[in-house]
Every structure is written in structure tokens, then in C-alpha cells.
Swiss-Prot record:
GO terms for cellular component: cytosolic large ribosomal subunit. Binds to 23S rRNA. Forms part of two intersubunit bridges in the 70S ribosome. This is Large ribosomal subunit protein uL14. Pfam families: Ribosomal_L14 (PF00238). GO terms for molecular function: large ribosomal subunit rRNA binding; structural constituent of ribosome. InterPro entries: Ribosomal_uL14, Ribosomal_uL14_bac-type, Ribosomal_uL14_CS, Ribosomal_uL14_sf. The keyword RNA-binding applies. Belongs to the universal ribosomal protein uL14 family. Transmembrane segments: none annotated.
Amino acid sequence: MIQQQTMLTVADNTGARKMMCIRVLGSSGRRYASLGDVIIGVVKDALPNMPVKKSDVVKAVVIRTVDTVRRPDGMCIRFDDNAAVIINNDGNPRGTRVFGPVARELREKNFTKIISLAPEVL
């Protein structure tokens, strides 16, 4: 469950390390984001000489959450951190690598490019 002011780890190689959620995209007044939801965030920590700089406002898709997500078959899934991948306006990832596992829920939301870059899909 990601809401405004939540700090997330950036799980790609765009140069950003930490970001803060400033808006959950969707219907008006939407409060929380879960796996596969798109958010707008600001980069709080970044590596030098990389495409994404500190204080850049970026779109990202949530790939891991600490909050438990229940699947239709009854299985519950939970991760150790809140993580996101920075995307462009077309929905494609800006980086060329994704670090760590991603949830299967991204495939249902048509983020297949992120699924193909991920080392493990849970």
C-alpha cells in the first residue's frame, strides 16, 4: 500500500536510488497504490552522471510492496521493501535492467517489458 510521502527503492539502472511518491494515478481522490499501479514521484537520491537526477519528477510503476497482497487463488505475497521502476510516458521502462524479483500482477496490467527484464517473477 503506497500513498503520498511513501519512500520507495528504485529497482532499475536509471541512476535513481530512492524516490518519494507524490501522487497515485488513477481515479480522482485515489489514496493507495498496490502492485502494478502507476505513481508519480520525485527522486530523492541519485547517482552522479546518470540520466535521472535528484529532484526530477518521474512516473513509476510499483513492483514490490511490504503490504500483503492476496491473490485470487488464496496465496498471499509480501516483499521486504517497497520498490518501483521508472517508466516513460508510453509505459516502457527508462532503464535497461531491473533488480530483484517482481510480482506476477504486472503481467495482468500489461507491463510485459518489465517482466522480461526482471531476473525473477513471483
